[in-house]
Amino acid sequence: MGMKINAELPLPANLKAEYPLPKELAEIKKKRDAEIREIFEGKSDKFVVIVGPCSADNEDSVCDYVNRLAKVNEKVSDRLMIIPRIYTNKPRTTGEGYKGMLHQPDPDQAPNLLEGIIAIRRMHIRAIKETGLTSADEMLYPENRSYLDDILRSEEHTSELQSR
């Protein structure tokens, strides 16, 4: 299998500076992270519910969904903490086919990893801004986490782990 480097990615700190998480949204994330920690440490009676589709590849549709989920969250927030799952990668056994927004932010265009990372940052930031809900994403490529760790909660896994 051949590999061609089309361009170098910027350093995560540089990309975060160019597409920053506004301070008021960073405070929301900090508060929600603390709430999640309290739940997992048994200091809260709430349950965490991570919910969302298997693929998030359209910003407007995703944000519409998260806005509707935020309304549900308002009704159950005394018992549950809802975390939208905004899954921006699609695992492929053979490596063929659409691999998700990370690789190809526009399914009708050629893959572009940098544009994908930017699109994901924008989408997650918009979701927080519109709803106050921070998101979870699944990182198929843990090295991408450093581009998004200020915005979302992530779980790193492989398809191999899923089959155990």
For the regions a protein language model found, what residue spans apply to each?
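Generic N-terminal targeting/processing segments that precede catalytic cores or assembly contacts
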Residues: 28-46, 61-75, 82
